């Protein structure tokens, strides 16, 4: 996956800004540490980076469950982890209207035609699950959740161990205050692992759960525009010193 990303970055000119949500966040951080000269700015939202820094429902489950259980999930899917099976496992398929209303942060009242339309769109999206390759899934469970290899510097990417301290690009960390999957501390620990100067690190904690980071009305209307403005600001590292 990192190899393909690297090919794409080269096709785009060799330097990019990266925005990584959830699992895409730790992958983006790995890329930025593996190829630090190719990432100008980095945004991580709801991304599990240092599992030992805090506990979430997901990391607690991964820690308490034997690896054989996850291998069994892959076997049941004939080499894949079936999205609808995992959804049932989490119980997220039973979201009621109040939970959806809270997640979307919409002003439309429950029972109104406008909310009914939003709810139908959400349920259609929510029912469209994605199957994951078993090899990838097991690697995430074992290396990220069981051994915390990203934070400890043991993760091997494209033949080399990843040293997060080599990543010195400006970084924005966005956490969900009530995240059931990624504890805010698991994300915010990033600032102590990377080589980015403190003045080039921005952090925000949004009043939502995990999915609200990219679906909540308030978050989309207030937090992401702030991140977008930050991304287009000049990078102070590239500014020439003022003449004496």
Feature roles, as predicted:
Residues 19-24, 28:
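Gly/Ala-rich beta-loop-alpha elbow adjacent to hydrolase catalytic centers
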Residues 181, 206-222:
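Catalytic histidine-centered segment of alpha/beta-hydrolase-like enzymes
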Residues 18-20, 45, 174:
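Short beta-strand immediately N-terminal to the catalytic nucleophile in serine-hydrolase-like folds
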Residues 167, 173-175, 179:
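Short beta-strand/loop motif that positions the catalytic acidic residue
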Residues 13-14, 27-135:
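Alpha/beta-hydrolase-fold enzymes
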């Amino acid at each position: 996956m990192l190899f393909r990303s690297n090919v794409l970055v080269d096709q785009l000119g060799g330097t990019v800004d990266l925005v990584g949500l959830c699992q895409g966040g730790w992958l983006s951080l790995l890329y930025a540490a593996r190829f630090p000269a190719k990432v100008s700015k980095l945004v991580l939202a709801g991304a599990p980076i240092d599992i030992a820094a805090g506990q979430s429902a997901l990391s607690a489950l991964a820690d308490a469950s034997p690896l054989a259980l996850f291998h069994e999930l892959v076997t049941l899917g004939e080499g894949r982890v079936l999205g609808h099976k995992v959804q049932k496992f989490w119980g997220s398929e039973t979201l009621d209207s109040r939970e959806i209303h809270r997640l979307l942060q919409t002003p439309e009242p429950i029972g109104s035609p406008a909310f009914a339309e939003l709810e139908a769109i959400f349920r259609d999206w929510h029912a469209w699950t994605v199957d994951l390759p078993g090899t990838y899934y097991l690697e995430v469970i074992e290396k990220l959740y069981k051994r915390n290899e990203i934070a400890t510097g043991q993760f091997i990417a494209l033949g080399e161990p990843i040293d997060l301290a080599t990543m010195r690009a400006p970084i924005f960390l966005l956490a969900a205050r009530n995240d059931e999957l990624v504890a805010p501390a698991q994300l915010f620990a990033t600032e102590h692992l990377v080589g980015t100067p403190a003045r080039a690190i921005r952090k925000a904690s949004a009043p939502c759960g995990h999915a609200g980071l990219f679906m909540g009305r308030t978050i989309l209307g207030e937090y992401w525009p702030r991140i977008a403005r930050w991304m287009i600001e000049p990078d102070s590292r590239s500014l020439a010193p003022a003449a004496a």
